[in-house]
Amino acid sequence: ICIVDTPGQMELFAFRNIGAQIAQELTDAEKGVIYIFDGLQCKDPLNYVMNMFLASAINTKFFLPQYHLISKTDLLSEAELEEMMRWSEDPYALEESIDAKLTGMNRSMSQEMMEIIGRIGMDFDPLPVSSANNEGFADLYSKLMLTFTDGGKFTP
């Protein structure tokens, strides 16, 4: 497995032609995209929806398998993580949080982005992960194995 992290470079990598060129030329092996939802930022429904929207835009640019992670889960309360996981499982729960927690333009913008994401048909099932306690990485590895090796092991 080769994972390339582009911290702080999403605009450069995802929205310019060079990003797609790098992805295509990096290796002849199977490829995918890991999109990371920053757990501390995404406990707010506006930021969660904005990340869904960005992940959707990246997916339409690369057309590669895409995996979604919620990072820094060790820094979230159990209730905060449960709420984000509920949002990913049930769009109506996210809509209810938008209505309850957002007002004005932020509410309208979130509702419109949710509608667009729904029309695109993106599925969001983020894995909670933490580099501090290694939570979720075995699940990510399993998902990658299912996609790229039909459940077999990776080989060099």
Model-identified regions with their sequence ranges:
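Canonical P-loop GTPase G-domain recognition
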Residues: 55-65, 73-156
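Gly/Ser/Thr-rich helix-start
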Residues: 9, 69, 135
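Conserved ATPase-coupling elements of RecA-like P-loop NTPase cores
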Residues: 11-17, 44-47, 79-80
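Acidic/glycine-enriched edge-of-secondary-structure segments
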Residues: 6-10, 97
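Inter-motif core of Ras-like GTPase G domains
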Residues: 1, 6, 15-42, 54-68
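Residues immediately C-terminal
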Residues: 9, 42, 75
